[in-house]
């Protein structure tokens, strides 16, 4: 149970939230104008020097730096009137390949403000809202947010955490990436395992078109396909691995999707389920990560599920117990947690 605080202290908490919300715009500016990258690893820097490097207006840069210092993103030296970014902040603010790079989350937030009228409507009506009905910045921001984590963990951690899976993929196998979106994980798998045939499925036509374009740019060797299909109606079978990457909780009928995966899987195959990190009870998730995920779940994940058949609305904080129950109801006999990160839990399900 939360401890009550004074009205004054609670007002201060809300001021902190409002300041963070407004500062998110400045963080996005810092990313898009190269301000963070220009500060990374250079030590103390003046507003004038930073403005010259980035070809931005000095007065705006000075005010931006003061905001960043007030938020603790950079440090300020009053004596020299200089600013610097600690090395420990670089992976979060300036390194786009780091799994801790979080700036794209602000692109997601920006998209949701643009969807405000739609969200007000569904809160009243109880209707759903498909991913494709959101502003396009949602898909782009989500891809940029998830990509570094997938590149860091998918091949070297999650796949290798499932006994025998890496060896099977290296020798040649068949893989489905269900709900593949723009194809980040699909392309990673195809490039890493050239003797394995990988198929990405997604119900969203525009996402599949983007994935196909990315596939051509990636230089895969012909072992990769993308197809428009839902999680319950792709016709291919004989898969050694079926992946659900941060998407099962978005589906209207997760049990139906898991049942279809069971039917499409080889007897010794495995389903790899990547889901947002969450405890099994609400009280386990009363923390900043839980707050973030409950927020996204309220305005993205739950509406997405409610827009589909069944509308189970698992939400982005379903937790391992509920996810395991889904897989068991679908007919899987073995479900185990094989890996985790600060933001994800990874389950492997077998027949």
At which residue positions do the language-model features occur?
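A short glycine-rich, Lys/Arg-flanked "PGG" loop and its adjoining helix->strand segment in the class I
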Residues: 255-267
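Core SAM-dependent methyltransferase catalytic element
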Residues: 330-351
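C-terminal alpha-helical "lid/dimerization" subdomain adjacent to the S-adenosyl-L-methionine
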Residues: 274-329, 336
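Conserved Class I S-adenosyl-L-methionine-dependent methyltransferase catalytic core
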Residues: 13-21, 27-30, 37-38, 67-173
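Short amphipathic alpha-helical interaction segments
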Residues: 56-67
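Short acidic, hydrophobic short linear motifs in intrinsically disordered regions
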Residues: 44-52
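Conserved adenosyl
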Residues: 113-249, 254-256
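Short glycine-centered segments of the SAM/dcSAM-binding site in methyltransferase folds
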Residues: 174, 269-270
């Amino acid at each position: 149970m939360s401890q009550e605080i004074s009205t004054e202290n609670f007002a201060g908490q809300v001021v902190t939230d409002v300041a963070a919300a407004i500062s998110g715009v400045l963080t996005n500016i810092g990313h898009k104008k190269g301000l963070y990258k220009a500060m990374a690893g250079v030590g103390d820097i003046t507003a004038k020097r930073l403005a010259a490097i980035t070809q931005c207006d000095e007065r705006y840069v000075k005010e931006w730096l003061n905001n960043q210092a007030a938020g603790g993103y950079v440090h300020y030296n009053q004596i020299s009137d200089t600013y610097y970014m600690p090395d420990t902040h670089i992976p979060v603010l300036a390194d786009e390949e780091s799994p801790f790079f979080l700036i794209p989350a602000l692109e997601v937030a920006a998209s949701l403000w643009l969807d405000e009228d739609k969200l007000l409507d569904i809160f009243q009506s109880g209707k759903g809202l498909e991913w494709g009905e959101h502003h396009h910045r949602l898909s782009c921001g989500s891809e940029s947010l998830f990509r570094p984590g997938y590149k860091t963990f998918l091949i070297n951690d999650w796949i290798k955490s499932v006994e025998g899976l890496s060896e099977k993929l290296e020798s040649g196998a068949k893989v489905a990436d269900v709900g593949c979106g723009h194809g980040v994980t699909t392309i990673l798998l195809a490039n890493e395992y050239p003797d394995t045939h990988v198929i990405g499925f997604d119900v969203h036509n525009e996402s599949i078109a983007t994935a196909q374009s990315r596939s051509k740019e990636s230089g895969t060797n012909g072992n990769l396909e993308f197809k428009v299909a839902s999680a319950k109606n792709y016709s291919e079978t004989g898969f050694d691995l079926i992946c659900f990457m941060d998407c099962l909780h978005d589906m209207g009928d997760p049990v139906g999707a898991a049942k279809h995966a069971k039917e499409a899987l080889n007897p010794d195959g495995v389903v790899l389920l990547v889901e947002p990190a969450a405890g099994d009870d609400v009280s386990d998730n009363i923390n900043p990560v839980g707050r973030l995920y409950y927020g996204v779940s309220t305005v993205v994940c739950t509406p997405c599920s409610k827009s589909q058949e069944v509308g189970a609305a698992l939400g982005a904080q379903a937790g391992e117990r509920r996810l395991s129950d889904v897989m068991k109801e679908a007919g899987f006999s073995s479900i185990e947690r094989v890996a985790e990160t600060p933001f994800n839990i990874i389950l492997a399900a077998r027949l």
